Amino acid sequence: MTGDRRLFLVGLSHKSAPIDVRERVALTGDALKAALCELKAMEGVTEALVVSTCNRVEVFVHSDRPDAARRFFTERSPAAADHLYAKDGVEAVRHLFRVASSLDSMVVGEQQILGQVKEAYGLASAASAAGSYFSRLCNRAFATAKRVRTETEIGRGATSMSQVAVELVEKIFGRLEGRAILLVGAGKMGALSAKALAVLGADRILVTNRSPERGLALAAQVSGSYRGWEELQRLLGEADVVIVSTGAPTYVVTRESMHAAMKARRRRSICLIDLAVPRNVDPACAELSDVYAYDVDDMERVVATSKQARQGEAIRAEAIVEAEVMAFAKEREARAALPVLAQLRRHAERIARAEAERTLAQVGGKLDDKGRKSVEAMAQAIVNKLLHGPTSRLKEAASSGDSALPGAAAELFGIENETAGGERREGGAEGAAAAPGAGPVRSQGT
């Protein structure tokens, strides 16, 4: 069943699904690009955006088919169906603005999510899945997030999953000086972890990464040491703490490798923190004696205190988000009137042109060029004067959020309302504004 084209969101996050469900539908690299192409090819979908992070996978589509995004999930993992949430229209807009502003994050106020949403939009644009609608929507979301960041102190305290992980390590071990801390992965999460460790006084930071160049660069930034990827097994036997965050789709630390490492450690305990989704550390490692393993879902309990401390700032941030959502909706309503105005003008000019041609045909050759132009100018002047009032009132109504008047005007004048229901053809509104009619009345005859 089809309807009006608008924004639809279907997704799951740390709030609705455990990590073992989220990792089944997580999308990265080529899989994410393929997903965008698949969504764009769905019947009724004009634009698509996918936000996939360690804590959420969300699909946004501009479509007239409410079930398009849901089918995308259920076809990949039937188990995801029980964990999905769905929003549309203004509610979907509000959700994206809250996500970009880190108000829906596990760590409220964290800075990474805005970059991740920007990256998601960049990928969608590069894949030709995002067009004019998502350009307006996402840029407004980014501006909202910037306001939240600059007008509140929502980012105060531990504001990334990596920082939370490092604070957990500090709570477990106390002082970090002298502790051997191994970072497996030198991407964004690894870099954030390294910096947070250095701030807390860690002085034995080891880095291993599949790409030596990236690993060497990160180790140098924090006065640490780089070790080759082939040394991972030996390093598991030496480190007190292992923080894992690679882009690998499978485990890089298995139960078997950890079992062998514990033999070499002679029962010396180890802390494993897995910040990756899909997980990089086999959950079965936690079954081994003296192995203390944590994944991203375990971090939620750690951040509870930090979240409570920022509650007041979160309330201020929510007010900013709400104001921006309403402003975006109001602008959309104003744009909704533009195609109706363009059609109304074209409709009036067609009638005026036909009447001018009929009049000129009746007078035959009695009028010279100047006379014919006078008739055409008179017809155009009548159109302009008749439409001046309705045009002004339509624009005023749209600016005040009245979406009913454009539809009523279309019905009253007997023209098709291309924007009935709100956003159905929002992508073409700018074009209609740029070319609001067929031009001045010109006779097609003599």
From Swiss-Prot:
Residues at the site labelled Important for activity: H95
Any matching Pfam family: GlutR_dimer
Keyword entries, A-Z: NADP, Oxidoreductase, Porphyrin biosynthesis
Biological process terms in GO annotation: protoporphyrinogen IX biosynthetic process from glutamate
Catalyzed reaction equations: (S)-4-amino-5-oxopentanoate + tRNA(Glu) + NADP(+) = L-glutamyl-tRNA(Glu) + NADPH + H(+)
Composition-biased stretches (Low complexity): 431-440
EC number: 1.2.1.70
Active site, renumbered: C54 (nucleophile)
Pathway named in the protein's UniProt entry: Porphyrin-containing compound metabolism; protoporphyrin-IX biosynthesis; 5-aminolevulinate from L-glutamyl-tRNA(Glu): step 1/2
Positions contributing to NADP(+) binding: G185, A186, G187, K188, M189, G190
Record GO terms (molecular function): glutamyl-tRNA reductase activity; NADP binding
Binding site for substrate: T53, C54, N55, R56, S105, E110, Q111, Q112, Q116
Quaternary organization: Homodimer.
Stated role: Catalyzes the NADPH-dependent reduction of glutamyl-tRNA(Glu) to glutamate 1-semialdehyde (GSA).
Similarity remark: Belongs to the glutamyl-tRNA reductase family.
PANTHER family given in the database record: GLUTAMYL-TRNA REDUCTASE
Name recorded for this polypeptide: Glutamyl-tRNA reductase 2
Organism: Anaeromyxobacter dehalogenans (strain 2CP-C)
Gene: hemA2
